[in-house]
C-alpha cells in the first residue's frame, strides 16, 4: 500500500445521499478476489445504459468530459452504506480515486477504505455543500487534501479541518494495511516467540 501524505486532484460530484455498496460495485462483479480490474464496473448501473457495459450514460457525472481523470469524489451523507464488501473501495481506487469526501460514511466502508489506502474525509454538511458548489461552478476545479495537516482546501482557497483516528492516520501516512502493520512489529513478535517456554509451545 502506498503512503498517503497529501493529494491535490480534479474533483467530481455525486450529489446523492445513501450511495450504497451495491451501487458502487454491483454484486454480479464480485467473483474476483484480487483488487485490480474493478474500476470499469464502478457505479455500473449509473455509468452504463446497458447490462454489458458497452453504452455509456452521457448524463452520469463520471462520464462527462470535464470530470475525466478525477481523483477526489465529493458526495452526500451515509456514503458506502449497505452490505459489507471490500470490493467497494477496491473499485473506487482502481478507477483512480484517492479521496472520498462526505458528511458521513457507513462504518464498515469507512474502515475498509482506510485498510485499502483510500482516504475517507468527513466534513460538515455546509462544508461539503460549499465544495460541491465550487466544483460545479468551475471546470477543472481541484481540491487539496493534506493528511498531515488534517486539512481540505477548496478550489477557492477555503480551508476546512477534518478528524481521523490517530491509528488510521498513522497507517495511511506510512502505507500500512493490516498485514503491513503486523510486519512492522516482526522483531517484537519474533522476540516474544523466542522467549515462550518450550512447555507452552
UniProtKB/Swiss-Prot annotation:
<comment type="pathway">
    <text>Amino-acid biosynthesis; L-leucine biosynthesis; L-leucine from 3-methyl-2-oxobutanoate: step 2/4.</text>
</comment>
<comment type="similarity">
    <text>Belongs to the LeuD family. LeuD type 1 subfamily.</text>
</comment>
<dbReference type="InterPro" id="IPR000573">
    <property type="entry name" value="AconitaseA/IPMdHydase_ssu_swvl"/>
</dbReference>
<protein>
    <recommendedName>
        <fullName>3-isopropylmalate dehydratase small subunit</fullName>
        <ecNumber>4.2.1.33</ecNumber>
    </recommendedName>
</protein>
<keyword id="KW-0100">Branched-chain amino acid biosynthesis</keyword>
<keyword id="KW-0028">Amino-acid biosynthesis</keyword>
<dbReference type="GO" id="GO:0003861">
    <property type="term" value="F:3-isopropylmalate dehydratase activity"/>
</dbReference>
<dbReference type="InterPro" id="IPR015928">
    <property type="entry name" value="Aconitase/3IPM_dehydase_swvl"/>
</dbReference>
<keyword id="KW-0456">Lyase</keyword>
<keyword id="KW-0432">Leucine biosynthesis</keyword>
<dbReference type="GO" id="GO:0009098">
    <property type="term" value="P:L-leucine biosynthetic process"/>
</dbReference>
<comment type="subunit">
    <text>Heterodimer of LeuC and LeuD.</text>
</comment>
<dbReference type="InterPro" id="IPR050075">
    <property type="entry name" value="LeuD"/>
</dbReference>
<dbReference type="InterPro" id="IPR033940">
    <property type="entry name" value="IPMI_Swivel"/>
</dbReference>
<dbReference type="InterPro" id="IPR004431">
    <property type="entry name" value="3-IsopropMal_deHydase_ssu"/>
</dbReference>
<comment type="function">
    <text>Catalyzes the isomerization between 2-isopropylmalate and 3-isopropylmalate, via the formation of 2-isopropylmaleate.</text>
</comment>
<dbReference type="Pfam" id="PF00694">
    <property type="entry name" value="Aconitase_C"/>
</dbReference>
<dbReference type="GO" id="GO:0009316">
    <property type="term" value="C:3-isopropylmalate dehydratase complex"/>
</dbReference>
